[in-house]
């Protein structure tokens, strides 16, 4: 085993090497939107998923609507159609299982409905604004954001949140990256836009399983919220 630098050890017979670990200060926090800073309980997308599937003639339960929460909304719809219970009801209704054409159609129908109701579910969660202000003003951290919402949806939330005193330094929407949660790309995009490195100096906060995985996939700290969990 050879000492390459003061922080890296390399074994020529191995495909792997030992690397240093960051032990410095936290420099940035990336927060999810619905269920983390506003819309306690994440009702906004859930009620729209219910409406979209009801319109298709295949009603779903609130539990089914919530299960994939955190994903890009088109992916969310696709995951609902892959649930055995939903597939069974779809087959009973149409004599076939749901396909990608159905997913695309439902997503097209979902978008205007979601944008239309976002303001009805845009109340900041108690303590969120105060917490972010403390992180920014007292700990001098940069504030980023990720979401399963698309850019037009985030634009609606920006205005509603800013009127309540919340404005992240960075916004990244699900349609700005090759693949959204649980993939790491939105976190990495935040790191670039916040100009924060290393990635280990960032904490990702979310109320969904995919949102927590997004942080761990990116290589940063990841914190899950329970009381507002979807």
Model-inferred region functions:
Residues 63, 144-145:
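Short catalytic-loop micro-motif centered on adjacent basic/acidic residues
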Residues 30-31, 142-144:
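Short glycine-rich or small-residue beta-strand-to-loop segments that form or flank ligand, phosphate
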Residues 8-15, 19-129, 133, 137, ...:
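N-terminal helical cap/lid subdomain that shapes the substrate entry/recognition surface
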Residues 1-28, 129, 133-139, 150-230:
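Asp-based, Mg2+/Mn2+-dependent phosphohydrolase catalytic module
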Residues 68, 146-148, 205:
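Structural motif
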Residues 59, 142, 221:
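Residue-level detector of anion-binding/catalytic polar loops
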């Amino acid at each position: 085993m050879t000492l390459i630098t003061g922080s890296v050890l390399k074994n020529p017979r191995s495909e792997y090497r030992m690397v240093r670990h960051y032990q410095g200060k936290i420099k940035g926090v990336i927060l999810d939107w619905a269920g983390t800073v506003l819309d306690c309980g994440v009702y906004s997308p859930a009620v729209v998923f219910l409406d979209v599937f009801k319109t298709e003639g295949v009603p779903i339960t609130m539990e089914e609507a919530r299960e994939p929460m955190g994903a890009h909304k088109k992916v969310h719809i696709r995951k609902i159609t892959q649930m055995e219970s939903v597939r069974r009801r779809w087959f009973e209704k149409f004599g076939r299982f749901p396909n990608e054409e159905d997913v695309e159609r439902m997503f097209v129908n979902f978008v205007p409905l979601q944008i239309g109701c976002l303001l009805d579910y845009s109340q900041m969660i108690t303590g969120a604004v105060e917490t972010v202000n403390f992180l920014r003003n007292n700990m001098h951290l940069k504030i980023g954001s990720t979401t399963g919402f698309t850019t037009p949806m985030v634009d609606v939330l920006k205005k509603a949140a800013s009127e309540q005193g919340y404005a992240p330094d960075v916004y990244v929407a699900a349609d700005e990256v090759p693949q959204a949660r649980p993939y790491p790309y939105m976190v990495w995009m935040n790191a670039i836009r916040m100009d924060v490195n290393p990635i280990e100096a960032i904490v990702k906060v979310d109320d969904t399983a995919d949102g927590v995985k997004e942080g761990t996939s990116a290589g940063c700290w990841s914190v899950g919220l329970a009381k507002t969990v979807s």
